[in-house]
Amino acid sequence: VLIIAVLFLTACQLTTAETYSRGRQKHRARRSTDKNSKWTRECTRSGGACNSHDQCCANFCRKATSTCM
């Protein structure tokens, strides 16, 4: 009986969460697209100009010369 009650409550929560998130689906898709574009951005190769570590493919920017290592 306890197992049936747990399954019933889980099903109720899943149904409620699904109907609540339907209105937010457009925003969720846009957010994941933005996240993917950050992951697939271009990086500067070794010897190229940089201002911060995250611009370089190797994630290291030498501040003294402003070049990627």
From Swiss-Prot:
<keyword id="KW-0732">Signal</keyword>
<dbReference type="InterPro" id="IPR004214">
    <property type="entry name" value="Conotoxin"/>
</dbReference>
<feature type="disulfide bond">
    <location>
        <begin position="43"/>
        <end position="57"/>
    </location>
</feature>
<dbReference type="Pfam" id="PF02950">
    <property type="entry name" value="Conotoxin"/>
</dbReference>
<keyword id="KW-0964">Secreted</keyword>
<comment type="similarity">
    <text>Belongs to the conotoxin O1 superfamily.</text>
</comment>
<feature type="disulfide bond">
    <location>
        <begin position="50"/>
        <end position="61"/>
    </location>
</feature>
<dbReference type="GO" id="GO:0090729">
    <property type="term" value="F:toxin activity"/>
</dbReference>
<dbReference type="GO" id="GO:0008200">
    <property type="term" value="F:ion channel inhibitor activity"/>
</dbReference>
<protein>
    <recommendedName>
        <fullName>Conotoxin Eb6.19</fullName>
    </recommendedName>
</protein>
<feature type="disulfide bond">
    <location>
        <begin position="56"/>
        <end position="68"/>
    </location>
</feature>
<keyword id="KW-0800">Toxin</keyword>
<dbReference type="GO" id="GO:0005576">
    <property type="term" value="C:extracellular region"/>
</dbReference>
<keyword id="KW-0960">Knottin</keyword>
<feature type="signal peptide">
    <location>
        <begin position="1"/>
        <end position="17"/>
    </location>
</feature>
<keyword id="KW-1015">Disulfide bond</keyword>
<feature type="propeptide">
    <location>
        <begin position="18"/>
        <end position="41"/>
    </location>
</feature>
